[in-house]
UniProtKB/Swiss-Prot annotation:
This is Chaperone protein ClpB. Keywords: ATP-binding, Chaperone, Coiled coil, Cytoplasm, Nucleotide-binding, Repeat, Stress response. ATP 1 binds at residues 208-215. Residues 343-550 are annotated as: Linker. Residues 161-342 are annotated as: NBD1. The lineage of its organism: Bacteria, Pseudomonadati, Spirochaetota, Spirochaetia, Leptospirales. The Clp repeat (R) domain probably functions as a substrate-discriminating domain, recruiting aggregated proteins to the ClpB hexamer and/or stabilizing bound proteins. The NBD2 domain is responsible for oligomerization, whereas the NBD1 domain stabilizes the hexamer probably in an ATP-dependent manner. The movement of the coiled-coil domain is essential for ClpB ability to rescue proteins from an aggregated state, probably by pulling apart large aggregated proteins, which are bound between the coiled-coils motifs of adjacent ClpB subunits in the functional hexamer. One of its GO terms (molecular function) is ATP hydrolysis activity. Its main location: cytoplasm. Residues 560-768 are annotated as: NBD2. GO terms for cellular component: cytoplasm. Signal peptide: none annotated. Residues 84-148 are annotated as: Repeat 2.
């Protein structure tokens, strides 16, 4: 017997047996030690063979461990003396005899068990016989498992039953009802069957965008095969999906991955076309396992694919097909592309109706049909970087999951009552310590109040528990119906007509009646008095879309409607003297939120014109604060930074091959992250004329393609462009309003191309600030300063004399409101900062800022 011709698993078992003997203090390595290690190997051959005989490997392991416990033990250091016992040597010799009979090159773990059952003489063989293990049955299952192969190298474990180890049986999953139903997609499934039925190159590859349902088509094919709804050519075929991860995992040595793949391919080949292999993300095979001098997985597939020995279905995205498969012309010609297009909104609704039952069953809730329609339409409109039906299914799933969590959590009403009880109990404990009459009276009142609250809480809790149990019962009945439907389908496949009739016209009818009565019982409870909601509506879907994208698509609450109607008035408190501009901006936002605006264009695109300091940028800030409750919630792009033609790359991202390609553009990335936003392009006349070309598709169709070829959606943005063109005309008092408009229009046409101007919704002229509004602007600026002082613990008020002074001294018709801002900062701000730094004030102190004798002074 050659001990150098052992498989790696047997080598490992003998090494572990020696370590085990040393640890237990046994003087020798016995057959029990070896068998214990052989039976303990989780991915070994011996446990697999015992399982295939419908016996429990655990029972055999326990018997072996019991026998080990009876072994003699010695004290002291045994490591130097541990050798093989007679029984172990006999076992290895018996195993070697079996190896020779089976014409194997290497001694393996299955030979050990076969040797024991054939020539073993010890008590362990008797125990194993009692457990039902017989030599001839074991030999038969071993030969079946090998499929006519012999052990020619030291790692046979990875090559036996490769399909069971490295692939999943989709037919089995379909029989168990674990695959989701596939609705529609009949054309693609038919095309896949056509390609599979060819004599050679019968390998379809499903190509489509991520999330359009490529894997679902294969699952649909598995369902059709199981139901027998396929042509004769692929009837009774078994569909396996390759698990590349488990094939690569644990392949430590060079060539081990190739061995496993070869074994799997040989198994598929030897099935004589009975097995169809599905490889999801097939591009991962290109380059998989390739090291110096080794073939990659795709090259190992090529000969079998070309000869038609391997029926394979691949699935990959358009981008990856182009990047990996098309590069390799030899691999590409062996596959027949089947293009899977994105379904339309109507088709998506049909798909969702088919899946609805599965999601209702999983979450234990009901999904209204209006929610399915909303999921398809809203996801199509607002989630532009993903594809149907995946994004619509995700919306349904998340809305259902949110509702399930709400059912399982304590309702708000109950939670409030519980918190009230806790606070009353704390107060009661405090009052018990008081001795005065008032406290004792309060304690009596509190006890009554607490008793009422607890009673109310118990009533609410009983209602909640009842509603929960009713919803839970509904889920239970639905699960029962699903179970019996699967049993019915299985019985129908086996041809058990009586069983089918018993389930279809007996059990299922009873369960359906039970479901209807449970639904009626739940509906009887008035919706007003219900604590729990178990229906997913379109409003729930809209809320999820809003959470994902930040776009307010849910129905407007009364408060929001009132706020939008008052939008113009709110903006007027922030921007003074530009009422016409504020009205036009407010109307655009109101149209959008009411759903009247064109859905394929931005909410509003405005060109603000006017001299410096009249409130163009301030209007944009006020609008951002109104819409998003945050002044900084706008993307501001200063166009003076884009004076060169090449600087457009900074907006949309550098093209491939240039530095910064992976970083994306400043504009496109900002909008991708926040689709509902305000974008301010400040001082656009400073930019290079070439830069304006990218505005054309943004302003017209509400989209822009970035440097990576991705479409960025601008349909939910407000776009404001500001410019100083014609500011000298608008700031002049020489012209009438009509003349100003005409002159500004001429200058605009001179500076911008007609196609750019034609795409802007409104050109809004901001007029110079007059002395009549400067007082109001001064009030706003001083209020800002007062708020800053308040944060530092100083309560400031301003006298009318001071307001008159800053209004007069800060007014400049040419420069607008900015000189006023600078004056307030310089004179009033400096006076306050000196007062604070002197340390003269105490926290919360009231001070007045006044203008006296030509100076700004702080008066306590």
């Amino acid at each position: 017997m050659k001990l150098d011709k052992l498989t790696s698993k047997l080598n490992e078992a003998i090494y572990n047996a020696q370590a085990s003997a040393e640890k237990l203090g046994n003087p020798e390595i016995s057959e029990e030690h070896i068998l214990k290690e052989v039976l303990s190997q989780p991915d070994g051959l011996v446990p697999l063979l015992i399982s295939k005989l419908n016996l429990s490997p655990k029972s055999f392991l326990e018997s072996t461990e019991n026998a080990l416990g009876k072994q003699p033990k010695v004290g002291g250091n045994t490591s130097a003396d541990v050798g093989f016992s007679r029984s172990a040597v006999s076992l290895l010799k018996a195993a070697d005899e079996v190896r020779k009979e089976l014409k194997d090159e290497y001694l393996s773990t299955d030979h050990i068990l076969l040797g024991l059952m054939k020539n073993g003489t010890g008590s362990l063989k008797t125990e194993f016989l009692k457990l039902g293990l017989e030599y001839h049955k074991l030999l038969k299952i071993t030969l079946e498992n090998r499929k006519g192969k012999t052990i020619m190298d030291d790692s046979p474990e990875g090559k036996t039953d490769a399909l069971a180890k490295y692939a999943k049986n989709l037919n089995e999953l379909a029989k168990q009802g674990k695959l989701d139903p596939v609705i529609g997609r009949d054309e693609e499934i038919r095309r896949t069957i056509q390609v599979l039925s060819r004599r050679t190159k019968n390998n379809p590859v499903l190509i489509g965008e991520p999330g359009v349902g490529k894997t679902a088509i294969v699952e649909g094919l598995a369902n059709k095969i199981v139901q027998g709804e396929v042509p004769e050519g692929i009837k009774n075929k078994t569909l396996y999906t390759l698990d590349l991860g488990s094939m690569i995992a644990g392949a430590k040595y060079r060539g081990e991955f190739e061995d496993r793949l070869k074994a799997l391919l040989d198994e598929v080949k030897s099935s004589d076309g009975e097995v169809i292999l599905f490889i999801d993300e097939i591009h991962t095979l290109v380059g998989a396992g390739a090291t110096e001098g080794a073939l990659d997985a795709s090259n190992m597939l090529k000969p079998m694919l070309a000869r038609g020995e391997l029926r394979c279905i691949g699935a990959t995205t358009l981008k990856e097909y182009q990047k990996y498969i098309e590069k390799d012309a030899a691999l590409e010609r062996r596959f027949q592309p089947v293009y899977v297009k994105e379904p339309s909104v109507e088709e998506t609704v049909t798909i969702l109706r088919g899946l609805k039952g599965r999601y209702e069953l999983h979450h234990g809730i009901r999904i209204l049909d209006s929610a399915l329609i909303a999921a398809a339409t809203l996801s199509n409109r607002y989630i532009s970087d993903r594809f149907l039906p995946d994004k619509a299914v995700d919306l349904i799933d998340e809305a259902s999951s949110k509702m399930r969590i709400e059912i399982d959590s304590m309702p708000e009403e109950l939670d409030r009552a519980n918190k009230r009880i806790q606070s009353l109990k704390i107060e009661r404990e405090a009052l018990k310590k008081e001795q005065d009459t008032a406290s004792k009276e309060r304690l009596k009142t509190l006890e009554r109040d607490l008793s009422e609250q607890e009673q109310n809480f118990q009533t609410l809790k009983a209602r909640w528990d009842l509603e929960k149990s009713k919803i839970g019962r509904l889920k239970q009945i639905k699960e029962e119906i699903e179970k019996y439907k699967n049993l019915e389908a299985e019985a129908e496949r086996r041809g058990e007509i009586n069983r089918v009739a018993e389930i279809r016209y007996g059990k299922l009818v009873d369960l359906q009646k039970e479901l209807e009565s449970a639904n009626e019982e739940l509906k009887k409870q008035e919706s007003a008095s219900r604590l729990l909601k178990e229906e997913v509506s379109e409003e729930d879907i809209a809320n999820i879309v809003s959470r994902w994208t930040g776009i307010p698509v849910s129905k407007m609450l009364q408060g929001e409607r009132a706020k939008l109607l008052l939008m113009e008035d709110v903006l007027k408190t922030k921007v003074i003297g530009q009422d016409h501009a504020l009205r036009l901006v407010s109307e655009a936002v109101q149209r959008s939120r009411a759903g009247i605006a064109d859905p394929n264009r931005p909410i509003g695109t405005f060109l603000f014109l006017g001299p410096t300091g009249v409130g163009k940028t301030e209007t944009a800030k006020a609008l951002a604060e109104f819409l998003f409750d945050d002044v900084n919630a706008m993307t501001r792009i200063d166009m003076s930074e884009y004076m060169e033609a090449h600087s457009v790359a900074r907006l949309i991202g550098a093209p491939p091959g240039y530095v910064g390609y992976d970083e994306g553009g400043q504009l496109t990335e900002a909008v991708r992250r926040r689709p509902y936003s305000l974008i301010l392009f400040d001082e656009i006349e400073k930019a290079n004329p070439e830069v304006f070309n990218i505005f054309l598709q943004i302003l017209d169709e509400g989209r822009l393609t970035d440097g990576k070829g991705r479409n960025v959606d601008f349909k939910n943005t407000v776009i404001i462009l500001t410019s100083n063109i014609g500011s000298e005309v608008l700031g002049s008092s020489e012209y009438t309003s009509e003349e100003k408009e005409r002159l500004v229009e001429q200058r605009l046409k001179k500076h911008f191309k007609p196609e750019f101007l034609n795409r802007i919704d409104e050109v809004i002229l901001f007029h110079s600030i007059t002395d009549s509004v400067i007082h109001k602007i001064a009030d706003i600026q001083l209020e800002g300063l007062r708020q800053k002082a308040k944060e530092n613990g100083l309560d400031v008020s301003f006298t009318n004399e001071l307001k008159d002074y800053v209004s007069k001294a800060g007014f400049d018709a040419e420069y607008g409101a900015r000189p006023l801002k600078r004056l307030i900062q310089r004179e009033v701000g400096n006076a306050l900062s000196r007062y604070i730094l002197d340390g003269k004030f105490t926290n919360g102190q009231n001070v007045t800022v006044d203008y006296r004798q030509g100076k700004v002074v702080v008066v306590v």
